Each structure stands twice: as structure tokens, then as C-alpha cells.
């Protein structure tokens, strides 16, 4: 129970800090407009999956954003290490959150049904 509580709190802290780091420290234009939607940290606190969304639906924009995030992951991890008081900073992996596009698609279908 305590271990789960700690990983949940760390997930929330990482989400907040990564959003701030992307907004203030990362200068790469490929990661502009990225929104961090969630973070999952493993029970041993060694790995963190960071879920993000972007406004564009284009595959090329997704690839550019993913490449920008992967390139900036070293800086992000270093900044996290200095901001968080934990023994070892988790390894970061970035995964696109598809739920935003799915929700948008559902919304469009509902609007279409209401018009008909």
C-alpha cells in the first residue's frame, strides 16, 4: 500500500515537473504545444512512462514530436533529478496518448448525429 502511494505521488510530481521543464527549459520547436496527460511509474521507481498529446493528427508531426522528446529526455531527466528528492531518477519513455484523438472522434460523431 505504501509503495503504491509513493509511486502515485511520484507520478504526479513527475507530470507537473516535466510539463514545467518542457515549457521553460526545452527550446526545441518540435516539442512546442506538447501536453503531458499522465505518468506511470513502476513499483520500483526505476522507469516512468510519460504520456503526451499534441494537437496535430499528422503522422509526420507525431514523429517529429517523438524525436524531439527523445532528444530532450536527457535534459528532462537531469532537471528532474535536481528538482525531485529521490535516490535515483527514473528512466523516461515517452508514449503518445491516443485518448485525446479518440475523444475528439467521438465528439465529432455525436455532433453529426445531433445535426441529422
UniProtKB/Swiss-Prot annotation:
<dbReference type="InterPro" id="IPR020053">
    <property type="entry name" value="Ribosome-bd_factorA_CS"/>
</dbReference>
<dbReference type="Pfam" id="PF02033">
    <property type="entry name" value="RBFA"/>
</dbReference>
<dbReference type="InterPro" id="IPR023799">
    <property type="entry name" value="RbfA_dom_sf"/>
</dbReference>
<comment type="subunit">
    <text>Monomer. Binds 30S ribosomal subunits, but not 50S ribosomal subunits or 70S ribosomes.</text>
</comment>
<keyword id="KW-0690">Ribosome biogenesis</keyword>
<comment type="function">
    <text>One of several proteins that assist in the late maturation steps of the functional core of the 30S ribosomal subunit. Associates with free 30S ribosomal subunits (but not with 30S subunits that are part of 70S ribosomes or polysomes). Required for efficient processing of 16S rRNA. May interact with the 5'-terminal helix region of 16S rRNA.</text>
</comment>
<keyword id="KW-0963">Cytoplasm</keyword>
<protein>
    <recommendedName>
        <fullName>Ribosome-binding factor A</fullName>
    </recommendedName>
</protein>
<dbReference type="InterPro" id="IPR015946">
    <property type="entry name" value="KH_dom-like_a/b"/>
</dbReference>
<dbReference type="GO" id="GO:0005829">
    <property type="term" value="C:cytosol"/>
</dbReference>
<dbReference type="InterPro" id="IPR000238">
    <property type="entry name" value="RbfA"/>
</dbReference>
<dbReference type="GO" id="GO:0030490">
    <property type="term" value="P:maturation of SSU-rRNA"/>
</dbReference>
<dbReference type="GO" id="GO:0043024">
    <property type="term" value="F:ribosomal small subunit binding"/>
</dbReference>
<comment type="similarity">
    <text>Belongs to the RbfA family.</text>
</comment>
